[in-house]
């Protein structure tokens, strides 16, 4: 049990069935074992496991209703901060909520930490960096601020959900990407790079799984699909809508390569695919810093198609050996259990 008795958590949803944010509920369920009292102010309540020391308060956070959201959240949060007096606040991906109460937590001398793992240097992040006790992130390069207040503790992946698969029949034909269909994820780059690789390896097949995060990103996704008409007609490209997170292990197990074009923070899906035993073809520098890249030349590290070519040149024995090594790194640095341990150390 932590030396801190009462923790207040901000998150977007308490719903273990949410296709994107179910992990927020999972984190709460782990933290209740370490604190005498856990209170969560959340944006939406769904299905979650109840505990005698857990209280959940619904602020009814609705996307697009910014002013109303802020008022409802403050109406719930401020009286609780004054009367409930938690000893520490953990804000899980909720930079706006942290911003809204940052001055109050500062004046009330309540320790306040924000989980933030993005490259974007938003106004809210900069404000929170000034008034909060710390910013918690996955890797040093996954937060745009360099400061003693930044704590890198890895990603939080339940390794039991991603067992290492049998690689004896690995064919390196089916490529998959799972993630938001947003411009930052570089779907168009992924498609063009696979098209280049197909000139040497025509058996390659690509599946992109995910949905746009908002109406603006939907325009981008629709344009990508229209521009990919020839690839769709040729039968080597497939688009699929987002799936529940519970289906991710099965999808990863049914493919040969995870391909990824995001140049920012360390995506959790990269860790999940690594745990399963998929080779990761990516230009993400945060991933390469921890796991390396396929190919020794800088040019190869920055080219998805050249990484595919390098992968194809490896013997199965050498490939499997490297994939096992990468899984060991992922378990050591990014398991949910160790993430919780490191988080509690920071919060205390």
List each language-model region with its residue ranges.
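N-terminal subdomain of nucleotide-sugar transferases
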Residues: 1-46, 337
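Glycosyltransferase donor-sugar binding loop
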Residues: 45-46, 178, 205-222
